[in-house]
Regions:
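An acidic-aromatic loop/edge-strand motif
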Residues: 6-8, 20-43, 94, 103-164, ...
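Active-site-adjacent substrate/metal-binding segments within catalytic domains
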Residues: 32-59, 63-72, 76-83, 89, ...
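Aromatic sugar-binding surface patches on proteins
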Residues: 96-99, 196-201, 634-638, 725-742
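Extended acidic/polar, glycine-enriched regions
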Residues: 107-109, 170-241, 645-646
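Short flexible loop/turn segments that cap and initiate beta-strands
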Residues: 177-180, 210-215, 607-609, 615-617, ...
C-alpha cells in the first residue's frame, strides 16, 4: 500500500463561508462563542454546525487495476462520505477512525471529487469541548487488487527470553501469494522471514519506558519474484503481566504513574497533529508521569505514535456514555447499534502499539450494575470480544456515586448536596453536576454497602477494577477482595503523594491516573475556585476547565510540583497564591498556586500562601532574608501564610539537620516582551511570548495584547492559559495571561519570519 498525503487543499464550507483548509481541521473554532451558546458549559459556549469538506483529485488511468482506500482518522460527528456525488459510507461516532474503499466509485483518467459532510448541529452532545469536522485528518492508500489487509496485521510479543513474536499478516487475493517480512533496526535489516502467520524468534532490544526501542517492519506481498504490495509499521517488543502482586512490564514491576488527558490540544482546539501530541507528552514525561488515560474516548493515531516513541503507557478508553444520556444529544443515541463496531475500530487501531496496555470500556456509566440487565449483557459482550481478539485486559472507570438511576433517586434525601441549581434555580440532575456536589465525599460513598452491592458483579466481569475517586476502598478491598487487581482510573491531584504510598503498600493497586495532567477546553470551571454566585458551572466567557497539573500552555501549577516530588523529578520547589478566605476550592483544583512571587502593588500587605514541595523532611522559608521558621514536610509539601512584600523568598531543604538545597523565587522588576522557541518539529513550531525582566523572571502581572504576523508560515493556533477569555484561538492576536501567551505555526517555506508586537515593541523570530 502506498500512503499518499491527502490532507492539503480541501474546500471547507459552513453556512455562507467557503475557504481552503489543510487537514486536520477543527470546524468548531470557526463557530461563535457567546452567552447562552448551545454547546453550553461542557462545550465552552461554542455553537454546533453542519460542515462540508470537498477535494478534487486526478486518478491516473494506470490505477484502474488498483485498490484505493480512504482512511478517515476522526470526524466529529455523523459523517457521510460521497465519491463523485454518490454516497458510499456513513459513520456515527466522532472518535473512531474508519476506512472507505473508493475503487469502484472512481473515474480513472479523470478528475474525481470526494465530499465528506459532518453534522454536528445537535448540541450539546459532549461534556467537554469536542471540536468538530475532520479534526484528525485523512489518508489515502493505494495498492494492487491483491493487497495487504493493513488494519488486520497483528504483531504480539509472547515472551522476551528469547524474544518471540506471534504474527498474522493477512491479505486479499484470489490466489495464494507469499509474504516476506523484514525487520529493521534503523537502516540495518536484523531479520527476514517468509510466511503470513506463525511464531518468530528475534535478537532485539525490548521496548520499555526508559528505552522505547522501536523497529520498522516491512511487509512484501510476493507473486514469485514480483512484489505485488508493500506495507510498513513501527513496533516495539514488550510483554505485559497483571497480578495481585502488581503490573509487570517486561517482567519488571511497574507502578502506573498516570494522568487523564483530554483529546484537545489547547490552542489548536481538537486538531490532532503529531508534533502537538509530542509537546504535551514531553511535559508529562518530564514531570515523572509514565502513563495516560485517553479521557474519555479513543486516542488519536498521532497520540499513540508519540507514546510509542516517548515511552508512555496508554489506557485507551472507548466512550463516555452507554445507554443513558449525559447530555441531550450525546452518543447514547447511537451506542447500542455500534458498540462492537466502535470497540473493533479502537482495538484494530491500537493492536500494534506497544504503548497501549489496557482497554477501558467507559467512564462513570449509569450502567452496567447489578440492577441493569441490558447494560450487564453489553458489558459481557464487550469483554468477550476483547478476550477473543486481543491479549490486553479490560477495565472501566467506575464512579461509585453514579449508582443505577433508581438507586441514585433513592439517595437524594440522604445526600442533600445532590441538588444542584442552575442560575435560574431549576433543579438539574446532570450527573456531572451531582458528583461535583459530592466532591471530596466520593471516596466515602465508594465504601458504602450500596456501592459494593451494585458494583460487585461488574468487577467480576472486568479484568481490572477501575476506581474513580475511590482511594478509600484500597484498604477495604485488600481485605474483602484480595483477588481484585485495581487501577485508580481517576483520582484527585492533591492525593497523588498519598496514593503513591498506598500503591506501594497495596500491590494489587497497580496504578493511578490523576484528573488531569493538562488543562483542557470545555467543562468550564470544573477546577475553578468559586464564590457564592458561581460554583461548578462557570458562566461565559469561561472556556477552560481550569484543572490539571499543568496549565493550557504547559506551565506547572503547585499540583505539578507535588507530582514531580512524588515521582522523583524534583527535590525542592516553590509556588504561591493570593489568600482569599471567601473563596471555596473546587474538588478538582486543590491549589491555585503558581511558580511566581510577582504580584501587583495592591497585593502588598495582603496575605499570600507559599507552598514548599520537597523530598527533604524539614524545610525553612525566608522572606527577604527573614526566617519564618522550619516546618515538617507532610505528604510532599508544607505551606506558609504571610503578608506579601516584594523581594524574594528562599526555601532551604534539611536532612539530618544539614542544609542540602535551596530554592529562590524573586519578584520581577521592570519587564519587556520576549520570545522563545519552545518546540520545533517537522510540522509545528511553538513560540512563547513572555514578559521578562533583566534576570529572566516572568512578570506574571502582565496582561497585554500580542499581535502576530507571519511570512513563510501559517498560524495554527494562538492563545494563553486564561480560563476566562473571549480571545479566539485562530485569530492573529491574543492577550497574555500570567505574563505569557503562545503561538503554534506551520512553516511553508524554507525559512519563515514571525513578528510579535505589543503596544511598545516588535520582536522578529526566524524559524
Amino acid at each position: 500500500m502506498i500512503l499518499k498525503d491527502f490532507n492539503s487543499n480541501w474546500k471547507f464550507e459552513k453556512e455562507n463561508e467557503c475557504i481552503l483548509v489543510d487537514l486536520p481541521h477543527d470546524a468548531m473554532l470557526h463557530e461563535k462563542r457567546y452567552l447562552g451558546g448551545p454547546c453550553g458549559v461542557g462545550g465552552a459556549y461554542f455553537s454546533g454546525g453542519f460542515y462540508t469538506y470537498t477535494k478534487s483529485f486526478m486518478v491516473p488511468k494506470e490505477f484502474i487495476n488498483h485498490s484505493i482506500h480512504l482512511h478517515v482518522l476522526g470526524a466529529y460527528r455523523n459523517s457521510l462520505v460521497y465519491v463523485n456525488n454518490q454516497e458510499v459510507y456513513s459513520h456515527k461516532y466522532g472518535y473512531t477512525d474508519y476506512f472507505v474503499e473508493l475503487t469502484k466509485y472512481l473515474n480513472y483518467g479523470k478528475t474525481n471529487e470526494i465530499k465528506i459532510t459532518v453534522d454536528n448541529t445537535l448540541v450539546p452532545n459532549s461534556r467537554w469541548y469536542s471540536g468538530a469536522g475532520l479534526y484528525r485528518g485523512v489518508e489515502l492508500y493505494i495498492g494492487g487488487m491483491d493487497h495487504f489487509n493493513i488494519n488486520d496485521i497483528k504483531l504480539n510479543t509472547v515472551s522476551l527470553d528469547p524474544i518471540t513474536l506471534s504474527y498474522t499478516i493477512p491479505y486479499t487475493s484470489r490466489k495464494k501469494l507469499d509474504v516476506l517480512m523484514e525487520i529493521y533496526d534503523e537502516d540495518k535489516c536484523i531479520k527476514k522471514n517468509k510466511g503470513a502467520s506463525g511464531m518468530l524468534n528475534i535478537d532485539a532490544t525490548p521496548w520499555d519506558l526508559d528505552n522505547p526501542k522501536l523497529y520498522t517492519f516491512k511487509f512484501y506481498l510476493m507473486d514469485k519474484d514480483e512484489i505485488i504490495d508493500t506495507y510498513s509499521l513501527e513496533y516495539g517488543f514488550r510483554t505485559l503481566e497483571y497480578t495481585t502482586k502488581g503490573f509487570y512490564l517486561n517482567g519488571k514491576k511497574t507502578i502506573l504513574k498516570g494522568a487523564c488527558l483530554h483529546h484537545d490540544n489547547g490552542i489548536l482546539g481538537a486538531k490532532s497533529i503529531y508534533d502537538a501530541e509530542v509537546k504535551r507528552l514531553f511535559i508529562l514525561k518530564n514531570a515523572g508521569f509514565n502513563a495516560i488515560r485517553s479521557a474519555h474516548n479513543p486516542a488519536s493515531q498521532h497520540l499513540l505514535k508519540a507514546c510509542d516513541r516517548l515511552g508512555i503507557l496508554v489506557m485507551d478508553e472507548l466512550v463516555d456514555m452507554w445507554l443513558y444520556h449525559k447530555t441531550e444529544y450525546d452518543y447514547a443515541t447511537d451506542f447500542k447499534d455500534n458498540y462492537i463496531k466502535d470497540l473493533k475500530s479502537m482495538m484494530d487501531k491500537d493492536y500494534n502499539h506497544p504503548s497501549v496496555i489496557m482497554y477501558s470500556l467507559g467512564n462513570e456509566l449509569a450502567s452496567p450494575t447489578t440492577l441493569d440487565k441490558e447494560g450487564f449483557r453489553i458489558l459481557n459482550e464487550l469483554c468477550d470480544y476483547i478476550h477473543k481478539n486481543d491479549y490486553r485486559p479490560s477495565t472501566m472507570g467506575v464512579n461509585f456515586t453514579n449508582l443505577e438511576r433508581e438507586e441514585l433517586n433513592a439517595h437524594k434525601e440522604r445526600y442533600k448536596m445532590m441538588e444542584v441549581y442552575t442560575n435560574s434555580d431549576e433543579i438539574v440532575d446532570d450527573y456531572n453536576k451531582i458528583v461535583t456536589r459530592f466532591g471530596y465525599g466520593m471516596a466515602e460513598i465508594a465504601c458504602a454497602p450500596d456501592s459494593e452491592r451494585v458494583s460487585i458483579d461488574t468487577f467480576k466481569v472486568l479484568d481490572l477494577a477501575g476506581y474513580n475517586y475511590a482511594y478509600k476502598r484500597y484498604d477495604l478491598d485488600s481485605k474483602i477482595h484480595p483477588e481484585r487487581i485495581i487501577v485508580g482510573t481517576e483520582t484527585m491531584c492533591e492525593d497523588i503523594y498519598k496514593n503513591y504510598e498506598r500503591m506501594k503498600k497495596y500491590p494489587q493497586v497497580i496504578g493511578d491516573f490523576i484528573w488531569t495532567g493538562i488543562d483542557y477546553l470545555g467543562e468550564v470551571g470544573i477546577g475553578g475556585y468559586f464564590d457564592h454566585d458561581h460554583h461548578f458551572q462557570k458562566p461565559y466567557p469561561w472556556i477552560l476547565a481550569n484543572g490539571g497539573a499543568f496549565d493550557l500552555l504547559g506551565y506547572p501549577t503547585g499540583e505539578a510540583y507535588l507530582a514531580m516530588v512524588t515521582y522523583g523529578k524534583a527535590t525542592l520547589e516553590l509556588a504561591s497564591y493570593i489568600y482569599d478566605e471567601d473563596e471555596t476550592k473546587s474538588a478538582w483544583r486543590w491549589t491555585n498556586s503558581r511558580n511566581t512571587y510577582t504580584y501587583k502593588d495592591d497585593v502588598i500587605g495582603k496575605d499570600i500562601v507559599v507552598e514548599v514541595y520537597s523530598i527533604y523532611p524539614i524545610v525553612e522559608l525566608f522572606v527577604n532574608g527573614k526566617s519564618l521558621g522550619k516546618k515538617e514536610i507532610v505528604n510532599g509539601f508544607t505551606t506558609y501564610k504571610f503578608p506579601y512584600e516584594k523581594g524574594s523568598i528562599k526555601a532551604i531543604g534539611y536532612k539530618d539537620n544539614k542544609a542540602f538545597e535551596e530554592k529562590i523565587l524573586s519578584s520581577a522588576n521592570e519587564s519587556k516582551l520576549t520570545a522563545r522557541i519552545d518546540y520545533s518539529g517537522k510540522e509545528l513550531t511553538y513560540i512563547y511570548f513572555e514578559y521578562k525582566d533583566r534576570n529572566n523572571i516572568i512578570d506574571t502581572t502582565k496582561e497585554e495584547i500580542i499581535k502576530v504576523s507571519l511570512d513563510g508560515a501559517t498560524l495554527v493556533g494562538i492563545g494563553s492559559a486564561n480560563p476566562r477569555t473571549e480571545d479566539n484561538y485562530i485569530k492573529n492576536e491574543a492577550h497574555t495571561f500570567l505574563g505569557a501567551c503562545m503561538i503554534a505555526v506551520k512553516r511553508n517555506a524554507a525559512h519563515a519570519t514571525i513578528k510579535g508586537s505589543d503596544s511598545k515593541d516588535t520582536i522578529d523570530i526566524t524559524i
